[in-house]
């Protein structure tokens, strides 16, 4: 349902998260320190509850890593 991976170019790293489902998905980026705002977001907003991301159906995001 959720496909996630990191990308790094030089000293810049980001997390790519894709919800391939037609249902809302909860996903916890364990061990990763997320930046504040997504660089790319296919939805109107990014919802976080505690340490979990709440992804809308078919939502995709690219978030900088600290």
Q: Residues of each region from the PLM?
A:
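Carbohydrate-interacting/catalytic domains
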Residues: 1-66
């Amino acid at each position: 349902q959720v496909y996630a991976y990191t990308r790094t170019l030089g000293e810049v790293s980001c997390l790519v998260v894709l919800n391939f489902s037609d249902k809302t998905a909860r996903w916890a980026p364990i061990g990763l320190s997320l930046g504040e705002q997504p660089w790319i977001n296919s939805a109107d907003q990014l919802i976080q509850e505690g340490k979990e991301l709440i992804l809308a159906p078919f939502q995709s995001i690219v978030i900088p890593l600290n």
